[in-house]
Design a protein with these regions (language model features):
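A short beta-strand structural signal in non-transmembrane regions
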Residues: 34-41, 123-124, 150-152, 175-180
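Small-residue transmembrane helix packing/gating motifs
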Residues: 30-31, 111, 152-180
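Conserved short loop/turn motifs at secondary-structure junctions
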Residues: 4, 34-45, 70-72
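Short beta-strand boundary microenvironments
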Residues: 25-26, 49-63, 67-134, 146-148
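Alpha-helical transmembrane segments
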Residues: 4-33
Length: 180
């Protein structure tokens, strides 16, 4: 009766109080954007009077960037796997504008450079990976492409593999279609 309902309310508030700080940390300290738009075709971004022109001319838009995102699978040397989203930007400086790359313990900054391959902490832990380890990304053609991990970043809500433009082009075999 009343005791059961009261218990459910307390549990609900407890869950809310334990989740909200994580959401706040992710959205205020680690990810810095107000909106993400998924594109079905890069032409929506680049055509005349397309999204890029609209964003450039809007006084409400402080900054924007073209990104590539795609779900894929990572594999470690032992055959363990994890599903992740690859994230790369048309301009590498956008990566550090929209994402903070740092360690969870100590908040040491992780540089984002031309050869960066940064994995979220929980995924690296689940695959038993450390900085300098080689792992494999399943490419669009089904082949597994080796990458060397350059950083393990604090993260709470997503499983992501952040790649520099050079690493992304190497993985894809050319310039990606910017879809986000």
């Amino acid at each position: 009766g009343v005791a059961g309902c009261t218990a459910l309310l307390l549990i609900g508030f407890g869950i809310q109080d334990s989740i909200l700080p994580i959401v706040d940390k992710q959205s205020e300290q680690l990810t810095h954007n107000d909106m993400t738009i998924a594109l079905s075709d890069e032409k929506a971004l680049t055509m005349e009077q397309g999204l890029a022109d609209t964003l450039d001319s809007s006084s409400a838009v402080h900054s924007w960037g073209a990104f590539y995102t795609k779900s894929t699978t990572l594999y470690n040397e032992e055959g363990g796997s994890a599903d992740v989203s690859i994230v790369g930007a048309e301009d590498d400086t956008r990566m550090t504008e929209y994402f903070t790359f740092r360690t969870r313990v100590g908040h040491d900054p992780i540089p984002f450079e031309e050869d960066s391959v940064i994995l979220t902490e929980k995924t690296a832990l689940n695959l038993g990976l450390s900085v300098g380890d080689t792992f494999y990304v399943e490419a669009a053609d089904g082949n597994r492409v080796p990458l060397t991990l350059t950083g393990i970043a604090e993260n709470y809500m997503f499983t992501r593999l952040y790649l520099s433009g050079a690493q992304l082009e190497s993985l894809l075999g050319g310039t990606p279609e910017w879809n986000t």
